């Protein structure tokens, strides 16, 4: 639930929702009256429903005691990419549905199965919620990259490193040789930003 709520019929003010333990604290109230210029304090009843809870809070209610709540997932386009443990796998569909329900921009939730053993270094995946489709569009720095997460290796965590290389190292007029390019995110981003450069890209995975 958002901590800031609109006030019907009042465009100049908003409600800031605090936990009751903070709202009852005189020192806290005085401090934020001064720093944030709160005008008044009221009690605001809140009716909590499924849509008000974060997906992890929902799983805390649904999963058996002792089962670890997933810490997060990687987003690739409109696909949530998870790495569930053996103890979490029996509840994979519950976990996937909670994530899908709370993230309307997502279409599919998948989890890795086993280790990387394929020649082309991609994971075996299982769809645990949503559409069983693995093709998606990942956008990095306004560049649209099409990929199938079931047939290629992809890591969104490398986006920061690609940004650093394109910004700090690759210059106009140079030749970029990426011999292990994957689906080519570095080459595509570099040539989009620096049209006067040349690029050579290759990967074992056709």
Residue ranges and their predicted role:
Residues 1-206:
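SAM-dependent transferase fold signal centered on methyltransferase-like domains
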């Amino acid at each position: 639930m958002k901590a800031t709520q609109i006030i019907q019929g009042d465009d100049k003010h908003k409600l800031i929702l605090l936990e009751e333990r903070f709202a009852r604290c005189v020192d806290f109230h005085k401090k934020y009256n001064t720093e944030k210029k709160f005008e008044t304090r009221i009690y605001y009843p809140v009716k909590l429903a499924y849509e008000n809870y974060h997906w992890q809070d929902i799983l805390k209610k649904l999963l058996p005691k002792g089962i670890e709540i997933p810490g997060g997932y990687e987003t690739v386009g409109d696909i949530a990419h998870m790495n569930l443990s053996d103890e979490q796998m029996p509840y994979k569909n519950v976990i996937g549905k909670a994530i899908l329900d709370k993230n309307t921009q997502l279409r599919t939730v998948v989890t890795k199965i086993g280790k990387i053993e394929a020649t082309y270094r991609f994971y075996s995946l299982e769809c645990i919620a949503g559409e069983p489709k693995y093709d998606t569009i990942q956008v990095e720095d306004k560049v649209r990259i099409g990929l199938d997460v079931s047939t290629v290796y992809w890591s969104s965590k490398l986006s920061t490193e690609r940004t650093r290389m394109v910004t700090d190292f690759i210059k106009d007029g140079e030749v970029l040789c990426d011999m292990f390019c994957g689906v080519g995110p570095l080459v595509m981003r570099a040539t989009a930003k620096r049209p006067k450069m040349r690029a050579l890209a290759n990967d074992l995975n056709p």
